[in-house]
Amino acid sequence: MGMRMMFTVFLLVVLATTVVSFMSGRASHGRNAAASDLIALTIKGCCSVPPCIANHPELCV
């Protein structure tokens, strides 16, 4: 392989890695949002229970 061919292959590998990394990062945003919603619902549940409010008042501000 010549230098140009090796450089071209290198650029293609970098591009493919970047695209895969970008797409997998995007896919995880939905999972993170779902986890955040679950945490928010749990905290709201805690705020409706007096003993939980007493133990964790910072959550119910």
UniProtKB/Swiss-Prot annotation:
GO terms for molecular function: acetylcholine receptor inhibitor activity; toxin activity. InterPro entries: Conotoxin_a-typ. It holds the Pfam family Toxin_8. Its main location: secreted. Expressed by the venom duct. Is not hydroxylated. Belongs to the conotoxin A superfamily. Alpha-conotoxins act on postsynaptic membranes, they bind to the nicotinic acetylcholine receptors (nAChR) and thus inhibit them. This is Alpha-conotoxine-like Am1.4. The lineage of its organism: Eukaryota, Metazoa, Spiralia, Lophotrochozoa, Mollusca.
